[in-house]
């Protein structure tokens, strides 16, 4: 559950930046970099082709990642 929240949070942040400027990279906070779960989420997104990593902790959404984000609503977006 915690991993999904981190992954979804990254996607929301990156999608917002992508809409503003698709070539802009985002620098992750030290707290995020220190989290093994967050690093795993970034690696997962990178391996899926959704995120490009310039150097460790500096990432941006790829066009593929942005399309996937727009086409698949986040799980907590559904109302019960």
Question: At which residue positions do the language-model features occur?
Answer:
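Alpha-solenoid repeat scaffolds
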Residues: 20-21, 52, 75
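A short, conserved structural fragment
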Residues: 46-56
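Short amphipathic alpha-helical interaction segments
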Residues: 2, 31-47
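Short, amphipathic alpha-helical interaction segments positioned at domain boundaries
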Residues: 63-80
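Short amphipathic alpha-helical interface segments
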Residues: 2-31
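A composition-biased, non-transmembrane "mature-region" signal
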Residues: 22-25, 42, 79
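Minor-groove-contacting beta-hairpin "wing" of winged helix-turn-helix DNA-binding domains
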Residues: 57-63
């Amino acid at each position: 559950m915690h991993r999904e929240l981190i992954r979804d949070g990254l996607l929301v942040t990156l999608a917002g930046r992508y809409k503003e400027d698709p070539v802009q990279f985002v620098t992750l906070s030290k707290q995020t970099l220190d989290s093994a779960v967050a690093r795993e989420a970034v690696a997962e997104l990178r391996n899926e082709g959704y995120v490009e990593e310039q150097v460790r902790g500096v990432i941006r959404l790829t066009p593929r990642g942005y399309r996937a984000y727009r086409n698949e609503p986040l799980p907590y977006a559904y109302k019960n």
